[in-house]
Amino acid sequence: MKVRAITLGCKVNTYESEYILSCFKDKGYEITNDIADIYIVNTCSVTNMSDAKSRKVIHRLVRENKNSVIVVMGCMIEANKDIKLDGVSIIIGNKDKAKVVELVEAYLKDREQKRLLYENFDSTFEDMFITNMESRHRAFVKIEDGCENFCSYCIIPYTRGRVRSKNPDTVIKEITTLVKNGYKEVVLTGIHTGHYGSDIETSFPELLKEIVKIEGLERLRISSIEITELNDEFLNVLKNNSVIVSHLHIPLQAGSDKILTLMNRKYLTPYFLDKVEKIREIRPDISLTTDVIVGFPKETEEDFLDTINFCKKIKFTKIHVFPYSRRKGTKADLMDEQIPENIKKERVKRLIDVSNNLEKEYLDSFISKTVSVLIEENKDGYSIGHTGNYLKVKILGDIKANEIVSVKIKERENLELVGEYEKDK
């Protein structure tokens, strides 16, 4: 039987889907990106739009694949536990993803809908371990699940539960296996990655110290980390280990202290700026990307301008801009002075323009420099990949995928760099 996974949302979902596919593959099922006998839909619910997108995918699959087994799982289910999904074979939240093959095989015997949802999450990490990823040149490794920050706009602590960390020995073994299988870059993922270890008497920096010792690992990337987790121990690890790439994604969410307080973020802008300055003392050319929510309740034009000016001051490489999305069950949903949609859209556009200008300025600083590029694909006569600081580079000619090569940057084409392969370096 053929199995296909459709993954929405974050890198954690991507990792979990890869793990589930590997379990099916081990049982003799065929993995496909085409028409399948079994569909796995790993949903997202971080915004109303992602929730609606998940529902749309499910309804289309049910309509077009009446004889297939359809499994729906993840955050959208956790956020809507009473949801009715006619035509869906198996409905689970985030707790039993490791049991999907077992559930599918039980369904194939009796053809009765399986629905496994719980009021509480387990206190321990649901172990998953992968050795390969389908069609990828960097491997994701999930080290943590859950979040306890309870930002006023966010549903995720309710859909993912409290922080649970993977055993550090398991993390090391998994990454070692992936490196032996040819992966040069590993990305550490989690719902709140920097809180790794808070439940098992260790810490994220302690884990990093062990990972960087793995022989053959050329690049270690952190998918996202909060500014409050960039403590002296972390900064010291970053300073002394070049295998950790010069790219950090640090969510800002707002550049107005008033809005940060309403969001229940754990810092204000002076703290954020101080940490960024310390990072740049260690890695002057580091790429810092971020997330910003615009149109949060009570956000005035002055508040929004504070955000624009702060982003310019930090000089982010790229800003992922999101209009505020009301989520039932969060404190922000009950706040007064909700911002009209037309104002949100206008602010999104303005901040994206700021982001594009900052990104171009950063990209231009690499013209005439030599950089290392992990080749990921060959397309239209070019080899395409990313630098350690996650800049997209294209090089004329075919270079073998999964190689890290030296490239001299010649020019910028909009938001991409164009370079020349330096064979002798």
Which residue stretches match the model-derived regions?
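Proteins enriched for Cys/Gly/acidic motifs involved in redox and nucleic-acid/cofactor modification
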Residues: 1-194, 233, 248, 270-281, ...
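Short, solvent-exposed loop/turn segments at secondary-structure boundaries
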Residues: 50-52, 162-169, 197-202, 262-265, ...
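Conserved SAM/AdoMet-binding glycine-rich loop
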Residues: 70-71, 79-82, 180-301
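Short flexible coil/turn linkers enriched for glycine and charged/polar residues
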Residues: 134-137, 147-148, 244, 254, ...
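Conserved, mostly hydrophobic/aromatic
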Residues: 151, 171, 188, 222, ...
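Contiguous mid-protein beta-loop-alpha structural module that forms a pocket-lining wall or clamp
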Residues: 299, 315-316
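Short glycine-rich, low-complexity segments
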Residues: 317, 330-334
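Terminal RNA-binding accessory module
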Residues: 334-425
